Amino acid sequence: MIELDQTNIPKHVAIIMDGNGRWAKQKNKMRIFGHTNGVTAVRKAVAYARQIGVEVLTLYAFSSENWSRPEQEISALMSLFMQALDREVKKLHKNNICLKIIGDVSRFSETLQEKIKKAENLTEKNTALTLNIAANYGGCWDIIQAAKQIAEKVKKEEMSVSDINNSTFQHHLATQNAPPVDLLIRTSGEQRISNFLLWQIAYAELYFSDVLWPDFNQLEFNRAIASYQQRHRRFGGTE
């Protein structure tokens, strides 16, 4: 492990968890085998983020475009999601972690929506780490739904056009009052954003790992944080 500067830990880390299917294929297994092992990698990432003092960890679990996958895989993913909620929520609560599901959950089954609501209610006052799971999420969707919320408030005269600024717009995003993303990690060697947190990553540092998500461990997470700490963030300014 690389020794980290504890005064320069990113407040908000976001991860595009990519490579579950390829990992399973390498082992001649079904894709769901990769997704199942991906849950273990999530558990490790959450533990490490909490350990080093990250305030917010946002994980891209299921995009709004993922519905185009085979029906069998979608069904398996939904079952896995429910199982993970059942198994992990009490552990998250015990570790003082606040769980939030960001995305359009209305497309999920009523059973899954109820599990999400219970999990969020149980952990809402926890303060050690906020864990955002992006499910049926897309960055374009997020910006549009925020704009609609604001437009509705202006229409009802609950706010004026002059009230609209970066801060108020950010408050209406799915991530609400979370700080902007400092570090965006994508696994599996792919180098694209894939419609994830488009507003929130405006000045994020990007780190692309060749490791497939089920193999992403605390050592690889440590390397990503160390890389972040070596960079000079200018936020559009000069040296």
From Swiss-Prot:
Substrate binds at residues 19-23, 31, 35, 63-65, 67, 69, 186, 192-194. Binds 2 magnesium ions per subunit. It catalyses: 8 isopentenyl diphosphate + (2E,6E)-farnesyl diphosphate = di-trans,octa-cis-undecaprenyl diphosphate + 8 diphosphate. Its EC number is 2.5.1.31. Disulfide bonds: none annotated. Mg(2+) binds at D18, E205. It comes from the Bacteria. One of its GO terms (cellular component) is cytosol. GO terms for biological process: cell wall organization; peptidoglycan biosynthetic process; polyprenol biosynthetic process; regulation of cell shape. Pfam families: Prenyltransf. Transmembrane segments: none annotated. Its cofactor is Mg(2+). Gene3D superfamilies: Decaprenyl diphosphate synthase-like. The keyword Metal-binding applies. Keywords: Cell shape, Cell wall biogenesis/degradation, Magnesium, Metal-binding, Peptidoglycan synthesis, Transferase. Homodimer. Belongs to the UPP synthase family. Catalyzes the sequential condensation of isopentenyl diphosphate (IPP) with (2E,6E)-farnesyl diphosphate (E,E-FPP) to yield (2Z,6Z,10Z,14Z,18Z,22Z,26Z,30Z,34E,38E)-undecaprenyl diphosphate (di-trans,octa-cis-UPP). UPP is the precursor of glycosyl carrier lipid in the biosynthesis of bacterial cell wall polysaccharide components such as peptidoglycan and lipopolysaccharide. This is Ditrans,polycis-undecaprenyl-diphosphate synthase ((2E,6E)-farnesyl-diphosphate specific). It comes from Haemophilus influenzae (strain ATCC 51907 / DSM 11121 / KW20 / Rd). The lineage of its organism: Bacteria, Pseudomonadati, Pseudomonadota, Gammaproteobacteria, Pasteurellales. The gene is uppS.
